[in-house]
């Protein structure tokens, strides 16, 4: 069995030598190719007799040499990832400061939504980060956004309730003069425009319901003209 695996190990050694002589132009593909060869070598260790010491030392030395061509790339990538983490910490700090400055009197939900969108785009610019930093940064980032998201939810709930009240008021319009009914509806429409967003889930549906509630006035107007 050990004799049968020797040619396979020799083949893997040849493959590593080829990578040293002709490194792949994409450092990530080059790294994956080395990983793949190392994986095959380990598979031979588990399925048959281990390599001889000299064969293992030769393979190990060659794989280390094969790494050289993409080492610089990975070192550069590591620096970029470390810097990205620094920048992301700054963004978290920036959001925390925004919360401190605004939590006594929050801007409108529209302003807050745009602010979070802007910060998210900024956050996305600083990817990737090191695996060891990823979860901690995510936790801190979501924690910093939470007070703003809570403020948006609270405002949208109030806006939803106010819009529902206006729909009820439209339903209550019941004047004999249809023109007065339309004037009253337009007055409520002006009030509606001043209310902020009720949230993506409800806003369009509420607007549609609001207008449908007034359809009866405009149908009557059309009939009067006809």
What are the residue ranges of the model-derived segments?
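Coiled-coil/CHCH-like alpha-helical segments characteristic
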Residues: 1-226
